[in-house]
């Protein structure tokens, strides 16, 4: 294991405070946009905190999964995955229920010439997600 890999593993170690918080959190966790820059690490950190807390709670991730191997990597960590295009209303409606939704989906890079898609991802989609998960706690997180 090289220095980068060691540092990455250290960052995935849940703190005592996180373990206590996740133990008190009601319901499962759904991460929309799990395939982005922050998603995989966040999903793994949540799953490790759940395991350390000794509780039974699902961590689920939704993405288009365009990165080869990511879906398998998340499965190996005990994270359920759901390939979906969040802009497709039928696919969004078919996603599992969750009391806790982390919204990480968005468009930041490669937006030149793709302004309409950027608008849809960053403006239209959050409203659709809020409607779909209106009975859930939603945290929107963006870089």
Task: Indicate residue ranges for each PLM-predicted region.
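Non-catalytic terminal and boundary segments that flank Rossmann-like NAD(P)-dependent oxidoreductase
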Residues: 1-30, 52
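Conserved Rossmann-fold NAD(P)-dependent oxidoreductase catalytic core, especially the SDR/UDP-sugar
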Residues: 28, 100-103, 108, 120-143
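N-terminal Rossmann NAD(P)H-binding glycine-rich loop of SDR-like oxidoreductase domains
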Residues: 30-48
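NAD(P)H-binding glycine-rich loop region in Rossmannoid oxidoreductase-like domains
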Residues: 40, 68-69, 73-121
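Alpha-helical structural signal in soluble globular domains
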Residues: 45-49, 73, 77, 128, ...
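Short, conserved loop/helix-junction motifs that constitute active-site signature segments
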Residues: 52-54, 95-96, 129-134
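Short beta-strand element of Class I
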Residues: 57-60
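N-terminal Rossmann-fold cofactor-binding loop
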Residues: 62-66
């Amino acid at each position: 294991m090289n220095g980068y890999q060691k540092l990455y593993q250290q960052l995935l170690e849940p703190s005592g405070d996180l373990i206590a918080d996740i133990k008190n959190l009601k319901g499962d966790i759904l991460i929309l946009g799990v395939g982005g820059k922050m998603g995989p690490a966040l999903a793994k950190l949540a799953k490790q905190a759940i395991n350390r807390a000794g509780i039974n709670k699902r961590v689920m991730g939704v993405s288009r999964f365009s990165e080869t191997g990511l879906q398998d990597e998340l499965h190996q960590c005990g994270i359920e995955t759901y390939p979906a295009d969040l802009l497709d209303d039928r696919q969004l409606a078919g996603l599992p229920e969750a009391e806790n939704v982390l919204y990480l989906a968005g468009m930041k890079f490669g937006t030149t010439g793709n302004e309409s898609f950027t608008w849809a991802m960053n403006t239209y989609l959050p409203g659709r997600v809020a409607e779909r998960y209106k009975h859930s706690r939603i945290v929107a997180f963006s870089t």
